[in-house]
Amino acid sequence: MGISRDSMHKRRATGGKKKAWRKKRKYELGRQPANTKLSSNKTVRRIRVRGGNVKWRALRLDTGNFSWGSEAVTRKTRLLDVVYNASNNELVRTQTLVKSAIVQVDAAPFKQWYLQHYGVEIGRKKKTAAAKKDTPEEGEATTEEAKKSNHVAIKLEKRQQGRTLDAHIEEQFGGGKLLACISSRPGQCGKADGDILEGKELEFYMKKLQRKKGKGAGAAA
């Protein structure tokens, strides 16, 4: 039969059936959802739509452009996991990429940018005193690498003055994964782009995930 968006097949308000008085029209067609999956085998289909226009239907994706709003920087990064969806838990279980889905992305590109921009390595595990004594040569090597020209040092120093980093984001950098929200529509434009979660929004979703984890642990017990 096919998916139809017309109202001819619907019953009347009184409950009676309507008689089909004309055939279906092309402009009343509906298409099945893309249900874009998180997979390394990237697959995007070209779809010709009304007016000769084109839509890009992403069926499988694993990368996207994500922007870090407070730092005004965007980087292409890997999608690692779908962790939350306000509308449907099934979409989390099946790792489906849709608009407004909360995902975990690889923090490495942003870490690299932060080091280059501010000269600060974030998310690095702090070594214990004993470990520091064991590896003195490594420390010497890093100080040699850190030597920069005078004008670069001045530039970095100037940037340091206005530098602020959310404690929750710093914590995430330690784990190498950042929480982000998809803002594009993968089934319509063929891309999974979005924003890194920050501030109140990040706190909100962290609480949601914590609660979900707690429920899961309770059910397992």
Curated annotation (Swiss-Prot):
A family per Pfam: Ribosomal_S8e
Keyword entries, A-Z: Ribonucleoprotein, Ribosomal protein
Biased composition annotated in UniProt, kind: Basic residues: 8-26
InterPro entries reported for this sequence: Ribosomal_eS8, Ribosomal_eS8_CS, Ribosomal_protein_eS8_euk, Ribosomal_Se8/biogenesis_NSA2
One Gene Ontology term from the biological process aspect of the record: translation
One MF term in the entry's GO annotations: structural constituent of ribosome
Gene Ontology annotations for the cellular component aspect, listed alphabetically: ribonucleoprotein complex; ribosome
Region (Disordered): 1-40, 126-151
Ribonucleoprotein recorded as keyword: yes
PROSITE patterns per record: RIBOSOMAL_S8E
NCBIfam families listed in its UniProt record: eS8 (TIGR00307)
Entry's family note: Belongs to the eukaryotic ribosomal protein eS8 family.
Name by which UniProt lists this protein: Small ribosomal subunit protein eS8
Natural source organism: Prunus armeniaca
Gene: RPS8
